[in-house]
Curated annotation (Swiss-Prot):
GO terms for biological process: tRNA threonylcarbamoyladenosine modification. It is found in: Cytoplasm. This is tRNA N6-adenosine threonylcarbamoyltransferase. It catalyses: L-threonylcarbamoyladenylate + adenosine(37) in tRNA = N(6)-L-threonylcarbamoyladenosine(37) in tRNA + AMP + H(+). It comes from the Bacteria. InterPro entries: ATPase_NBD (IPR043129), Gcp-like_dom (IPR000905), KAE1/TsaD (IPR017861), Peptidase_M22_CS (IPR017860), TsaD (IPR022450). Binds 1 Fe(2+) ion per subunit. CDD domains: ASKHA_NBD_TsaD_bac (cd24133).
Length: 337
């Protein structure tokens, strides 16, 4: 089976073609980073309009790169939610229109299921069951995964997501958008031990996260200290260490609770080098293994949507002709495959 996948949930327009026998055939992506940089964050209306401009050329490019015609496509998958509703509707309209005109089945995919399954695009894939740490600008959650669609959310952020905390703290430090990667780059120049940031909610039972207080602590520290480059780097490192330690502590707790030996990390923050190293070291000590997608599949992309959609289309799941974008959509409400 061969599926065209479309991703437009936020500020990346992604289109890909995935074949269940040959793997990923093409992967095209347009990022709106430059468009939103002057505003310090994503402007929903501008994001939607830019998706409209880019989506048709990217669909054509993805098909050409895969050496496909419409006759070679067996189904269409598109991100139905969660995300910015205007942006979602661009991809949903395109996906539904293509499926209808080609007389192919279509399926709306949960954006976070796409991230969760992104490591399946690699050669070394995790076996079920596994624990998934999904960390992005909009979500931070721990999920027990028994199979595709068999999800139990064990914990999630009660306020800011980890990626949001990275971006907001970076903005407080005067770093350009997108701030998370720039803060990590600055932290690489830092010296450990100069500052100690709290590890939120690690002294309490449970697996939920909270990062808003950490952001406030960072703001107060930034305001109280000098603005020289080394001090800024030290603060950035202390912040990054606090986020990574918090995520690692919660992962260890969840692994003990579930008894799982495999850990998946996915979402934009999963590209963070310090987080990957910390979790890899932890899993080695526990006799387990950590899995994550390559860097280009940590952020939003059409490949993960094509893969996730293919699994559901193969199981006979399809959507009706209605065009829907779901801004909020609990992951654990999805049907199993």
């Amino acid at each position: 089976m061969r599926v065209l996948g479309i991703e437009t949930s936020c500020d990346e327009t992604g289109v890909a073609v995935y074949d269940d026998e040959q793997g990923l055939l093409s992967h095209t992506l347009y990022s709106q980073v430059k468009l939103h940089a002057d505003y310090g964050g994503v402007v929903p209306e501008l994001a939607s309009r830019d998706h409209v401009r880019k989506i048709v050329p990217l669909v054509k490019q993805a098909l050409a790169d895969a050496n496909c015609t419409l006759d070679d496509i067996d189904g269409v998958a598109y991100t139905k939610g969660p995300g910015l509703v205007g942006a979602l509707l661009v991809g949903a309209c395109m996906g539904r229109a293509l499926a209808y005109s080609w007389d192919k089945p279509a399926i709306g995919v949960h954006h976070m299921e796409g991230h969760l399954l992104a490591p399946m695009l690699e050669d070394d894939v995790p076996a079920f069951p596994f624990l998934a740490l999904l960390v992005s600008g909009g979500h931070s959650m721990l999920v027990a995964v028994e199979g595709i669609g068999k999800y139990e959310v064990l914990g999630e952020s009660v306020d800011d997501a980890a990626g949001e905390a990275f971006d907001k703290t970076a903005k407080l430090m005067g770093l350009d958008y997108p701030g998370g990667p720039r803060l990590a780059k600055l932290a690489a120049k830092g010296e450990s031990g100069h500052y100690r940031f709290p590890r939120p909610m690690t002294d309490k039972p449970g697996l939920n996260f909270s990062f808003s207080g950490l952001k406030t602590f960072a703001a107060n520290t930034i305001a109280a200290e000098s603005d020289d480059e080394q001090t800024r780097a030290n603060i950035a490192l202390a912040f990054e260490e606090a986020v990574v330690d918090t995520l690692s502590i919660k992962c260890r707790r969840a692994l003990k609770q579930t008894g799982y030996k495999n850990l998946v990390i996915a979402g934009g923050v999963s590209a963070n080098t310090r987080l990957r190293s910390s979790l890899a070291e932890m899993m080695t000590s526990l006799g387990g293994k950590v899995y994550y997608p390559r860097g280009e599949f940590c952020t939003d992309n059409g490949a993960m949507i094509a893969y996730a959609g293919l699994q559901r289309l193969k199981a006979g799941q399809t959507d009706d002709l209605g065009v829907k974008g779901i801004p909020r959509w609990p992951l654990d409400t999805l049907p199993p495959v």
